[in-house]
Amino acid sequence: MSQRFTLMTAALLAAALVSVDALAATASAGARSYEDLALNGAGDRVAALESVNPPDAAKRAHASVVVRDAGSGKVLATYDPCPHCLYNYPSWSPDGKALAFIGNDSHSGNAMLYLASDGKVRAISTFKGVANTARWAPDGQRLALLATVGARKSTGATQAGAPQVGEIGTDEDEQRIALVPRSGGALKLLSPEDTFVYEYDWMPDGSGWVVTSAKGNGDNNWWVATLGHVDAGSGALRVLAAPKTQLNMPRVSGDGKTVAYIGGLMSDFGSVGGDIFTVPLAGGEPVDLTPGFNGSFNGLDWRNGQLLATAQMGGEQAVLAVDAASGSRRVLWSQQAGVGTACEGCVSFSADGTRAATALESFEHAPHIVAGRLPELAAITHDNDALPAHVAVRSISWTNDQFTVQGWLLSPLKVDAGKTYPMAVIVHGGPAAAVAPGYVTPGKSTRGLIHDLTAKGYFVFLPNPRGSYGQGLTFSSANQRDLGGGDWRDILAGIDAVEKVAPVDDHRLALMGHSYGGFMTMWGVTHSQRFKAAVAGAGIANWISYYGQNGIDQWMIPYFGHSAYDDPAVYRAASPIESIKAAKTPTLITVGERDVECPPAQSVEFWHGLKAMGTPVSLVIYPGEGHSFQQPASRADERARTLAWLDRYVK
């Protein structure tokens, strides 16, 4: 058979590593990353999770908690008490003398809350399960955290799902707020046992928390989460507001009277973009504080009675001061750079709001920590200064319908005059997301693929079509009830715009993407003959069957307006499988075996349709993987297959 339906074994995955990454892994060894930054209250020390890419591509980088002087970048302390742990979100005590962080140990199944000070670290609480987001009480004598006791899977819909055996839907993981005294001890679970808490913020007097939460399955119900208050004494939950759109980052004002949050149409928890809304702590209707803002807020904090926010504005990341009464705003700092994994809100601020720290990177420059008094942020780390640029980049803008659309064009460093080049179009996930600058380096997931493509002579186009972040709520919600419509036209118009300014051969185009990008790839090959090859990762072929198969069906209601049972026509109209007879493009399909968000059944259905049409197709299902591949071997194999597929059908 010319088509392959392959279930990869661990041995085959390991063997596949030699194809692409033997040289690439060596080239990227030593690149340092900085994540989950936390600036202390005084603004003179910064903690971060730091890791160095290992020379062996089959191994995952292990991060340590590193404390640096925020002026010089000098390392003051390094903490790594658990060799198998994934740490998250270091948090400074109010007096700045201690640092708390969580370690989740995949080997033992334990979660530990660690306390570090004066160069020493100890676990002050341990339990079976997973945890994240430790935060100090205002008095510095207690710590709160989000705990899932006896968790069946890692938290989040992008993680591999729990085995679906036995009676389904009767035993859900619930993430709850828990308290631990500074001196240590067992968890005290506070929030209701039938409710999944996504985010929280301490009340200024330590009496409780504002939360975003939903009853039942946490993976599925974030899209209908409400804003609430949990009492630290009784654990009682009181709903403050139930907005019709999604909400992130609840933050309580210093006087305890107002809650601010980021709200808007969002397709994935953790992918944040919207306007700033406020609501009284007593409850009431949320008010959009920033209507008409031509960007997407993605971070939020109160400082001295005003809001400090981060936002994506077109191709730039910015820090803004926002008046909590009028909504007036001024840009304090902006740069064409990416900060997406730097910290929970992208930028961390000192207690008085005058100083900040974040980790910046661009397509051409590796990450580095910048810190200082706003707006003058200066580099304090130089570990990656010697790493070279692997691509050339330009921001591309074009108009389609009533919108101005932005994207990125990456190209080989050396382009010969008079020569034309193939181009890969990579559609981001989401749809509520956006491509922001990130260092292109060998061996790093999508960025590693971009490196390998440009090294082979490809141009790479990364469009941000309607539905993406960066241009306000009107733009990010313009794909409602129109997936595969205006967004697809934006992408095609973007390709046309690129071909007017770059030496791209229209007869050597490839289309690819993962998640929403996988759906758009399936849509593209059933609605266009323009592409010579396609790679659809974790795509959606049939929205009707998908509605009943996935573990997050609540996300579709905001986009389609109704359930698939109430309005099947709009779901059918957006389904690539409805046009499968038009599909002629050779397509590689990849998906994780335990993908909760886009189950492998969708990929199998599309593979089956292409096979029936006689279209060249290959399907690879990666064992044990979820929506976001975690194993380096899986990522390397997917990348190797992608390059081989394009070499076969495009070059």
Describe every region a protein language model picked out.
Residues 70-73, 116-119, 181-185, 231-235, ...:
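Short loop/turn segments that connect beta-strands within beta-propeller blades
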Residues 38, 91, 135, 201, ...:
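Conserved beta-strand position repeated across blades of beta-propeller domains
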Residues 344-651:
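Serine-hydrolase catalytic core recognition
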Residues 25-27, 74-80, 122-125, 187-191, ...:
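A short beta-strand motif characteristic of beta-propeller blades
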Residues 28-63:
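Beta-strand-rich domains and repeat architectures in extracellular enzymes and scaffolds
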Residues 50-65, 80-87, 100-113, 126-132, ...:
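A flexible loop/linker signature enriched in serine peptidases of the S9 family
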Residues 46, 96-99, 140-143, 209-210, ...:
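Hydrophobic beta-strand positions that form the internal "hydrophobic ladder"
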Residues 41-42, 94-95, 138-139, 204-205, ...:
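Residue-level detector of Asp-centered blade-edge/turn motifs that repeat once per structural unit
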